[in-house]
Curated annotation (Swiss-Prot):
F-type ATPases have 2 components, F(1) - the catalytic core - and F(0) - the membrane proton channel. F(1) has five subunits: alpha(3), beta(3), gamma(1), delta(1), epsilon(1). F(0) has three main subunits: a(1), b(2) and c(10-14). The alpha and beta chains form an alternating ring which encloses part of the gamma chain. F(1) is attached to F(0) by a central stalk formed by the gamma and epsilon chains, while a peripheral stalk is formed by the delta and b chains. Belongs to the ATPase B chain family. GO terms for cellular component: plasma membrane; proton-transporting ATP synthase complex. It is found in: Cell inner membrane. It comes from the Bacteria. F(1)F(0) ATP synthase produces ATP from ADP in the presence of a proton or sodium gradient. F-type ATPases consist of two structural domains, F(1) containing the extramembraneous catalytic core and F(0) containing the membrane proton channel, linked together by a central stalk and a peripheral stalk. During catalysis, ATP synthesis in the catalytic domain of F(1) is coupled via a rotary mechanism of the central stalk subunits to proton translocation. It is a single-pass membrane protein. One of its GO terms (molecular function) is proton-transporting ATP synthase activity, rotational mechanism. This is ATP synthase subunit b.
Length: 156
């Protein structure tokens, strides 16, 4: 093998290329690689944090939904209880009002009955006085007495 000038020139140019690459190109390549590695690591870390936050948010949302369901159940139970109380109160008020109306009607009926009885008493006493007056004016006759009493009884 002959070592000639071309081979030496190629070795020198290769050495210059290596020196130039390590001095000027290689630091930029390493910097770009390190930057890319850092960006990828940050992205993976952010993805992991996002996954953890999603899990936590899912858990919190489940807790919130459960709390809301419990509150809704409680509110519905209270509303049903209040509704039944209102119904019972309305029934009691209606019964009291009905009893009051019935008592008023009975009192009014009793007053009307008493007025009617009083009116009948006055009419009976007036008829009795009129009958006694007629009997006293006429002669005492049994047949006439009986006829007058029958007439008075028919008028009653």
């Amino acid at each position: 093998m002959n070592i000639n000038l071309t081979l030496i020139a190629q070795a020198i140019s290769f050495a210059i290329l290596i020196w130039f690459t390590t001095k000027f190109v290689w630091p930029y390549l390493l910097n770009a690689i390190e930057t890319r590695q850092k960006t990828i690591a940050d992205g993976l870390a952010a993805a992991e944090r996002g996954k953890q936050e999603l899990d936590m948010a899912t858990q919190r949302s489940a807790e919130v939904v459960n709390d809301a369901k419990q509150k809704a159940t409680s509110i519905i139970a209270q509303a049903e209880k209040r509704a039944s109380e209102i119904v019972e109160e309305a029934k009691a008020n209606a019964k009291a009002e009905g009893d009051r109306i019935i008592a008023g009607a009975k009192a009014e009926i009793d007053q009307e009955v008493n007025r009617a009885k009083e009116g009948l008493r006055q009419q009976v006493s007036a008829l009795a006085v009129a009958g006694a007056e007629k009997i006293l004016r006429k002669e005492i006759d049994a047949k006439a007495h009986a006829d007058l009493l029958n007439a008075i009884a028919n008028e009653l």
